[in-house]
Amino acid sequence: MASTAVGLGGGEGDPGAGGPPAGSAHPDDASSMSDDVFEDAETTQARIEELRRRPFGDGSYNPPAAPASVSASITTTTTQQQQQHHNPSHHHQSSHHQPSHHHHHHHHSQLSLTGSHHYHDDAIMAPVQRSATGYPGYRPSREAMQMYAYGTDDYDDDYNDGWRSYRYDEVDMHPAPSNAHQQPFDDTVNHKTILLGDSGVGKTSFLVKYNTGEFRLGSFSATVGIALTNKVVVVDGTRVKLQIWDTAGQERFRSVTHAYYRDAHALLLLYDVTNKTTYDNIRAWLGEIREYAQEDVVIVLIGNKADCSGSERQVKREDGERLGREHNVPFMETSAKTGLNVELSFTAVARQLKSRGYEHGDDGKFNVHDFVRDNTKARSVCAQCRNM
């Protein structure tokens, strides 16, 4: 029984899919063919050339050469080998000359009944368990059958009779489940996280509080250009690296910050609850984000300076929640002075980035909206601010 490798991934006559264009000549040099492809003595190079020139159907088909890329293995039983089964002397003679090869295929068939097979899919090897019955009703393509048939009559009888001479030994044409392809999170990536918002909303104090745990009242002037710091957030034992950028909020620096949107992984958009203008400008900021940032960028809306007194507050908490729902982004109120929800905002970003950081996209196990809602702390002081 001869084992013949057939690439099933390529199309007929497609130079990029494993076979040459129609009309290309096969090599005449017999040494260019693998010795173990055809075993029968009657299958000579002249015989192969004769079969290649014999038309199939309307005569327009020109069988492609065996592709160099092997993606499937088909075990064939030739007509002559079927006759060996009925001719003990011939079978004995073949076995005498090639005992090791015959034993190899017997052992190979046993492996196909119980083995754990692998399916090669875009350079990713994924383990797949299959039963010995294979795939009921499956037939190889007519092109593959024609390529290795020993004559038109043999081919037609073989194909129409359920291709009894052909069977799959260890092939899985079904891709493995997506989680089998999923690669571990890459903890070496620096995830660019940008703080955005009008000048004076407290972005620098917010970052310093997260980075050092300190609040320095009145010690910062308006940020000029870009400043950054690096932090590592550990999420369920996995290190998520954040490269946090503090941007200038002034209009004259807006063209500078636009350039940083394009490769940003996450954006924290802040407004000042004591300054309604900064809240009103959020929609303009979101418009810029939609225009310049990546489509799947993580966005968190933040109402900062929530430690304010009731008389100072100009934006209700409910207004921030409504704006977040309107743009489908999570919302929370924070205080760089007291530390309220400052760490939570970066933790939410890190968890969302980890969830998305697998090779095949979101693992489907984390919802940033639920996480923020379940973990946002209610302000213990000045509660009347929320009920204005």
From Swiss-Prot:
Residues 87-109 have a biased composition (Basic residues). Residues 7-21 have a biased composition (Gly residues). GO terms for biological process: protein transport; Rab protein signal transduction; regulation of exocytosis; symbiont entry into host cell; vesicle-mediated transport. A lipid is attached at C385 (S-geranylgeranyl cysteine). Residues 386-388 form a propeptide. Residues 47-56 have a biased composition (Basic and acidic residues). Residues 1-115 are annotated as: Disordered. GO terms for molecular function: GTP binding; GTPase activity. CDD domains: Rab26. It is found in: Cell membrane. The keyword Chaperone does not apply. Gene3D superfamilies: P-loop containing nucleotide triphosphate hydrolases. The modification Cysteine methyl ester is found at C385. Residues 67-86 have a biased composition (Low complexity). GTP binds at residues 197-204, 246-250, 304-307. Disulfide bonds: none annotated. It is a lipid-anchor. GO terms for cellular component: endosome; Golgi apparatus; plasma membrane; recycling endosome; synapse; vesicle. Participates in exocrine secretion. PANTHER family: PTHR47978. This is Ras-related protein Rab-26. It comes from Drosophila melanogaster (Fruit fly). The gene is Rab26.
